[in-house]
């Protein structure tokens, strides 16, 4: 190492060490009595702070501050600005972008104490604090015969999902989750506490809905709720498809232009090394009668699946039911500290030959890498509700996406890092060629991090966002 490199490293180490030792002195005096400061070097750090869903591309904190009041957050931000200390806000910890890996020598503002839920049944409004997750609100909403757009996992943060868009199985009926957002309480990057809505700071409210993670700390958010569809009952259909993949993609393509607003499809593809074949599971959620669901799903059910199941459940039990109940088992989308490397892309239609050729590429990669446990997820959600809001009304730029593909690399072997990244980038390019869009389209909440702001927000909206 050259002398300049040694000096740079030494100065960085000294600065980081000094900041680590001084966190209590800097932030402690003005925090409320129950707020906590935890150093990353503390033995109990991982037990008392919110852990991430994936450790791949994780940030490197000096420590975390756990505020209890909005004033605490204001104080933390003002002190951080004064001393040029970087900070990241942690809600549910479900983000997966690798851009966080570049975060060093800063602090986490851990919002774990901000989980209040208030449902005003008469006003049909729901207010949640900044770290509330969907499992906190599902039962209260169901009991009141109300609903909002929900994701496929109960551990996702309500506010975090909203700020990036908020796709879900109900979006055909109610639009994106951000379309139901009415107002937020926000601590700005300079430490001011303001309320933001269509009538208060309307330009900022525009930006918050789709690019909200860039504008401060949302301490609470208020939503319009909707009358529960079909009396609060939902049909869940699971299909374990045969290994003839071409017919599966052909069945999926049958819904390219005809997916009803009440129907949402999710396909999960994994690899069975025993039989040396990728396996496909199909989940369908239908907000209506079971007989109608089965009729609509005939393109899949006519394929003579290995196994299938259809059940009608209360909507608050839906997430425990999908994929034969496998989604609710320990692990997967809600277990913490997993190693998951995700790339994503949005499509406008299903190009069957492109899917067939990709399955061959995927099979070859599995065979070449025996310790690779990758999978991919296809979310085909209806767009009628999302498209009912003018594109110009919010910063969210991808209402026209019909299908989101998550290419998920699950592995712990560090030697797989380069080949997995190369393969998943090539996979994304493969689907981009037949995506139906001129440019790469990626939902920001699913973004890997290498796509760039033009992809996350589009060039058309980036100018306004930059001005904000």
Swiss-Prot record:
Origin superkingdom: Eukaryota
Cofactor(s) of this protein: FAD
Domain FAD-binding PCMH-type, residue spans: 54-228
Positions annotated with a glycan in the UniProt record: 44, 272, 348, 464
Induction field: Expression is under the control of the azaphilone cluster-specific transcription factor azaR.
Pathway info: Secondary metabolite biosynthesis
EC number, UniProt record: 1.-.-.-
Gene3D superfamilies: 3.30.465.10, 3.40.462.20
Keyword set, alphabetical order: FAD, Flavoprotein, Glycoprotein, Oxidoreductase, Signal
Annotated protein name in UniProt: FAD-linked oxidoreductase azaG
Signal sequence bounds: 1-16
């Amino acid at each position: 190492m050259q002398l300049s490199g040694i000096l740079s490293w030494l100065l960085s180490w000294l600065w980081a060490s000094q900041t680590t030792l001084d966190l209590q002195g800097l932030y402690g005096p003005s925090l409320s009595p129950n707020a906590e400061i935890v150093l990353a070097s503390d033995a109990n750090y991982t037990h008392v702070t919110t852990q991430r869903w994936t450790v791949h591309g994780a940030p490197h904190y000096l420590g975390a501050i756990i505020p209890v009041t909005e004033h605490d957050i204001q104080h933390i931000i003002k002190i951080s600005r004064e001393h040029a200390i970087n900070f990241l806000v942690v809600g549910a910890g479900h983000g997966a972008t690798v851009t966080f890996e570049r975060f060093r020598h800063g602090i986490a503002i851990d919002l774990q104490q901000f989980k209040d839920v208030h449902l005003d049944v008469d006003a049909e409004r729901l207010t949640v604090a900044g770290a509330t997750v969907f499992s906190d609100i599902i039962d209260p909403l169901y009991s009141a015969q109300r609903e909002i757009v929900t994701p496929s996992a109960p551990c996702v943060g309500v506010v975090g999902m909203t700020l990036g868009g908020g796709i879900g199985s109900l979006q055909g009926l109610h639009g994106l989750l951000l379309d139901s957002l009415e107002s937020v309480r926000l601590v700005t990057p300079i430490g001011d506490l303001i309320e933001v809505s269509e009538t208060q700071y309307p330009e900022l409210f525009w930006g918050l809905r789709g690019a909200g993670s860039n504008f401060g700390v949302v301490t609470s958010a208020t939503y319009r709720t909707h009358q529960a569809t079909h009396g609060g009952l939902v049909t869940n259909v699971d299909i374990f498809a045969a290994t003839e993949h071409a017919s599966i993609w052909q069945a999926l393509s049958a819904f390219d232009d005809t997916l009803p607003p009440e129907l949402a499809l999710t396909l999960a593809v994994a690899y069975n090394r025993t039989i040396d074949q990728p396996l496909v599971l199909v989940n369908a959620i239908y907000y209506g009668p079971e007989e109608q669901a089965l009729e609509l799903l005939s393109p899949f059910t006519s394929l003579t699946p290995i196994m299938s199941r259809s059940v009608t459940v209360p909507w608050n039990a839906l997430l425990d039911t999908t994929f034969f109940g496998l989604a609710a088992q320990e692990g997967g989308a809600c277990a913490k500290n997993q190693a998951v490397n995700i790339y994503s892309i949005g499509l406008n239609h299903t190009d069957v030959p492109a899917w067939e050729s990709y399955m061959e590429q995927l099979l070859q990669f599995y065979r070449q890498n025996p310790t690779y446990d990758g999978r991919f997820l296809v979310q085909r959600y209806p767009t009628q509700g999302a498209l009912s809001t003018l594109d110009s009304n919010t910063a969210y730029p991808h209402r026209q996406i019909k299908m989101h593909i998550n290419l998920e690399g699950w592995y712990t072997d560090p030697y797989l890092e380069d080949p997995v990244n190369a393969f998943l980038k090539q996979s994304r390019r493969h689907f981009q060629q037949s995506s139906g869009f001129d440019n790469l389209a990626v939902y920001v909440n699913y973004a890997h991090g290498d796509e760039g702001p033009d992809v996350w927000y589009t060039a058309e909206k980036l100018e306004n966002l930059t001005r904000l």
